[in-house]
Swiss-Prot record:
Coiled coil: none annotated. Residues 1-56 are annotated as: Disordered. The modification N6-acetyllysine is found at K263, K275. The keyword DNA repair does not apply. There is a cross-link at K275 (Glycyl lysine isopeptide (Lys-Gly) (interchain with G-Cter in SUMO1)). Component of the small ribosomal subunit. Interacts with zinc finger protein ZNF277 (via zinc-finger domains); the interaction is direct; the interaction is extra-ribosomal. Interaction with ZNF277 competes with the binding of RPS2 to protein arginine methyltransferase PRMT3. This is Small ribosomal subunit protein uS5. It is found in: Cytoplasm; Nucleus, Nucleolus. Residues 35-51 have a biased composition (Basic residues). Residues 7-34 have a biased composition (Gly residues). The modification Phosphothreonine is found at T252, T270. It comes from the Eukaryota. Citrullinated by PADI4 in the Arg/Gly-rich region.
Length: 293
């Protein structure tokens, strides 16, 4: 209500007692048009959102080579992209393969401030986790002047950062994979998160933030260990995501490439060498004997 009054030129408007507070909140430039500028910016934001909604209904026109290959059905699955470590620059590629099964959840929205000459400029930072609960998970972080814009940007970045999750067994290989294949560790800042395999039926033993990411990754049972300043939710989530993404960064013996011993050319073409061999006679000349006394 105070902001609306300020925009209308009330007590909290430009030149009024609330000018510094509102200027600190939005960080406008100039003293006379701060309230009106904010109002116009907010209106334009709504217009962009409406036009963006209509644009989403339009047909996807890829702008990258990978996008063209995906749309033309030359690439059949995300795993083909991950196999060759191709960078994904368009979020529509993820929607093309996983659109129906993807679920997103906002982990946190926190205000961040920057000190300027006009006061404090406040923006909103959104942390969004996205996954299909079946081996794919992503984490996006976006900062914007408006909450809705930050969430939309974080969802797009989360789609672009989706990684495959490797799952395994705690003991015997019975049924479907249900836990992490072995102990993995992720780190961000001072936060260190360790994921430990757990027996079937244990569930996810962890704090709420890693639990959401592990559930979205499709991991049913897991022990976790965390140290550092885990109250910093951003670093906590990033460390967990780093640990999950490391499940495919190592090779276990069952993934070792089978060694095939091939014969050397001398062994392979022995018969040919025998047939084409010609005996060369070498005449040895004997040096004359030297008489010794």
């Amino acid at each position: 209500m105070a902001d609306d009054a300020g925009a209308a030129g009330g007590p909290g408007g430009p030149g009024g007692p609330g000018m510094g507070g509102r200027g600190g909140f939005r960080g406008g430039f100039g003293s006379g048009v701060r309230g009106r500028g904010r109002g116009r910016g907010r209106g334009r934001g709504r217009g962009r959102g409406a036009r963006g909604g209509k644009a989403e209904d339009k047909e996807w026109l890829p702008v990258t080579k990978l996008g063209r290959l995906v749309k033309d059905m030359k690439i059949k699955s995300l795993e083909e992209i991950y196999l060759f470590s191709l960078p994904i620059k368009e979020s529509e590629i993820i929607d093309f393969f996983l659109g129906a099964s993807l679920k997103d959840e906002v982990l946190k929205i926190m205000p961040v401030q920057k000190q300027t000459r006009a006061g404090q400029r406040t923006r909103f930072k959104a942390f969004v986790a996205i996954g299909d609960y079946n081996g794919h998970v992503g984490l996006g972080v976006k900062c914007s002047k408006e909450v809705a814009t930050a969430i939309r940007g974080a969802i797009i970045l989360a789609k672009l950062s989706i990684v495959p999750v490797r799952r395994g067994y705690w003991g015997n290989k019975i049924g479907k994979p249900h836990t992490v294949p072995c102990k993995v560790t992720g780190r961000c800042g001072s936060v260190l998160v360790r994921l430990i395999p757990a027996p079937r039926g244990t569930g996810i033993v962890s704090a709420p933030v890693p639990k959401k990411l592990l559930m979205m990754a499709g991991i049913d049972d897991c022990y976790t260990s965390a140290r550092g300043c885990t109250a910093t939710l951003g670093n906590f989530a990033k460390a967990t995501f780093d640990a999950i993404s490391k499940t495919y960064s190592y090779l276990t013996p069952d993934l070792w490439k089978e060694t095939v011993f091939t014969k050397s050319p001398y062994q392979e073409f022995t018969d040919h060498l025998v047939k084409t061999h010609t005996r060369v006679s070498v005449q040895r000349t004997q040096a004359p004997a030297v008489a010794t006394t």
